[in-house]
């Protein structure tokens, strides 16, 4: 039997709660998982309006060919007879490697490419300059492990299709990507191969894999069998988030409604949720598998990935030998881009831009 006893009082739990609130305020974001972004109805309607305009324009015109007459871009640039490459930068931070990309673009004719930037509007980003100036498209928030990254890529595709009918290839680029060859080398690779194929359709360069130890968990990330009947497990694919698509495949992406209904659903198992790595490979594998190479032009090192992020290269690793190694592939083609590089790699990369990177 206790010698002393204290009267119970509601004051003690009240004080405890009040003292806990500041702690929860400061530590909560680091303890609780972030709320996943979902696709809102207004955002969906905005995108559908954009997609419908791009679809209507694309279907009213022929696919870009070398004999097309000169046209004028909706952003004001004058097009030429030759097909173009649309470089689409998807970023949620500053474009740290803009100076390197400037060298890449400045070594070729400005009428052979267009640039489009989707920059997360919730993050303050240093305004791009030079050839990147005024290239940010109307953008919306993005978040990892959410369908917003799919929406951003589709938004870029539709904008580029609507802007210039001569955009024949659409290369999705990360802010952590660097070029591994000159623009002329890339251009020749994409379009000379087309000539060698005797005017057959262009091929899309997108990784499409049907085997992965995590595939089943990712397929059920939204709940068991939620993806059916639109996508059965044997149709589910995985691939790189970054790709180089033909115009006809870009059109298929923005026309799609059926698969999007499932891929836009929020994930229950966030750790297995990488929608952007599955939507594009799955859709194009189902729609036109023979029109895709099933490999990407972007080299990524997954040997020591951390929390779903690939190996990040730092300045001590940057060398001419690294560039030559990153170009190598298991096929007859060469990789054209590489990621992931830390921002402080810019200086050593710029030092060997002319002598190594753009010397093909």
What are these regions (language model features)?
Residues 1-360:
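ER/Golgi luminal nucleotide-sugar-dependent glycosyltransferases, focusing on the catalytic module
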